[in-house]
């Protein structure tokens, strides 16, 4: 009887180990979606008279698309990337991180992360509650979030 129990226990361990060893399946942005988001954000800002840069990153924080508009400031590509990274990292708009830093002095320690930027313009891109990437816009003071949202809106039907 003890042999049967031992064999049963070994089988249970092996079966549970193989079930846990499956690959994770994650949703991610495609290049086509990232291009549509970046172009949508750029079009919105240009229509308002701004010269901006737009960055779209994937769920792991890797750049997919960066656009530097005609006449955009030299700093704007980096600013757009950092805003997107901030939104992805904290799973919230980069403006929320700015508010958090203003409300909680201990949050300033997060400034040590080289790609974090506490300015509006970065928005997470979500499928339900799952953050699959982020978009950042730099160069349209007070309107960066609006431009980022316009980009996300271009692919909203694909984010369901």
Describe the role of every protein-language-model region:
Residues 1-7:
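Bacterial N-terminal signal peptides that target proteins for export
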Residues 16-19:
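N-terminal signal peptide c-region/cleavage motif recognized by signal peptidases
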Residues 21-160:
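Flexible, solvent-exposed loop/hinge segments and secondary-structure transition points
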């Amino acid at each position: 009887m003890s042999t049967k129990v031992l064999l049963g226990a070994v089988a249970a361990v092996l079966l549970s180990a193989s079930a846990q060893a499956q690959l994770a399946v994650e949703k991610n942005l495609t290049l086509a979606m990232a291009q549509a988001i970046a172009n949508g954000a750029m079009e919105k800002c240009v229509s308002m008279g701004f010269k901006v840069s737009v960055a779209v990153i994937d769920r792991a924080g890797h750049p997919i698309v960066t656009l530097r508009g005609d006449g955009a400031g030299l700093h704007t590509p980096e600013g757009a990337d950092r805003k997107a990274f901030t939104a992805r990292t904290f799973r919230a708009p980069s403006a929320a991180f700015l508010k958090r830093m203003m409300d909680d002095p201990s949050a300033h320690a997060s400034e040590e992360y080289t790609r974090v930027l506490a300015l509006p313009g970065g928005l997470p891109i979500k499928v339900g509650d799952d953050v699959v990437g982020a978009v950042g816009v730099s160069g349209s003071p007070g309107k960066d979030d609006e431009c980022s949202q316009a980009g996300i809106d271009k692919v909203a039907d694909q984010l369901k």
